Structure formats: C-alpha cells, structure tokens
C-alpha cells in the first residue's frame, strides 16, 4: 500500500520527514520516479535523501527521481535554462552573501556543494552558473567524472 497524502499542507517534503511520518526506516521506503515511474533502488533512495531534493506529489502520492532521470533532466535543464556564469568573487558581490551561505547545487547530480567544493571553484578559477534561477557548480564526484570524459569538439 502506497502512502497517500490528501492535504497538501501535511505533505512531507523531504525523505527524512516522510520516513518519520510513516514510521518506516529510510531503507524500507519504496518510491517511484516522477519521470519514468520505475521504483527507485535503495541506493537511489539514499542518493535522493543525501542530495536534499524535495519530494513531488502526483495524485496525492510522493515521488522522487531515479539516477538516470536525474542526470538526464539536469542536462536538459542546463541547456534550456542556462543564464550566465560568474566567478566566486563576483557571485558574492551579486548576492551580497558569502559562498558558504549560498545554496549552490551541482549542475549535474543536484547535490548541494560543500564549502570545500565551493572553495575549489575559486582556487581553480572555475565559474558558477545561474541555471533556472539557481546557482550551480560541480561537486567533486562530477568534477572528476567530467574531467575524464572527452570534450565536445567544435567544428
């Protein structure tokens, strides 16, 4: 039996909150992907919880996103909604906040960047990107992975 939440005001928005409300351990939560409708694996449930993404509701049922759809729709989002890129110092002056106080997600896997990852952008002179009204960069895992991928050539 899947959990159903009729009242939008009472809907848990995070996996941790859903786990508490249903009194089910995180490992036993069974959720479907909002895009492909496949059931998430345990690893995907944990990954979703670690990225601090919010649950979405369709017909009063909670949905998350699987890894394949997350990577695919993150790329679509990047291409459709990219606005501009800035260096860390410029981002701080634009927002009037320090980088450590800003929520900056990885543009690829959507995990929140740690203070160390934000500092690495500054040290390596890598830019942050405004995509769909949110600031993004690269987490260390995606940074390493994309540095191994062949670059697109321009002809």
Swiss-Prot record:
Zinc finger (unnamed): 33-69, 106-142
Quaternary structure and interacting proteins, as annotated: Forms homodimers. Interacts with ubiquitin-protein ligase UBE3A/E6-AP; this interaction stimulates UBE3A ubiquitin activity. Interacts with host TP53 and EP300; this interaction inhibits TP53 activity.
Location in or out of the cell: Host cytoplasm; Host nucleus
Miscellaneous remark of the record: Belongs to the low risk human alphapapillomavirus family. The cancer-causing human papillomavirus E6 protein has a unique carboxy terminal PDZ domain containing substrate but low risk E6s do not possess this domain.
Biological source species: Human papillomavirus 56
Role description: This protein has transforming activity in vitro.
Cellular component per GO, a single term: host cell nucleus
Primary location recorded for the protein, binned into one broad class: host cell
SUPFAM superfamilies per the UniProt record, alphabetical: E6 C-terminal domain-like
InterPro entries attached to this UniProt entry: E6 (IPR001334), E6_sf (IPR038575)
Sample GO molecular function, one term: DNA binding
The protein's name in its UniProt record: Protein E6
Top-level taxon of origin: Viruses
Pfam families per the UniProt record, alphabetical: E6 (PF00518)
Family of the protein in this entry: Belongs to the papillomaviridae E6 protein family.
This protein's UniProt keywords: Activator, DNA-binding, Early protein, Host cytoplasm, Host nucleus, Host-virus interaction, Inhibition of host innate immune response by virus, Metal-binding, Modulation of host cell apoptosis by virus, Transcription, Transcription regulation, Viral immunoevasion, Zinc, Zinc-finger
GO biological process, alphabetically ordered: DNA-templated transcription; regulation of DNA-templated transcription; symbiont-mediated perturbation of host apoptosis; symbiont-mediated perturbation of host ubiquitin-like protein modification; symbiont-mediated suppression of host innate immune response; symbiont-mediated suppression of host type I interferon-mediated signaling pathway
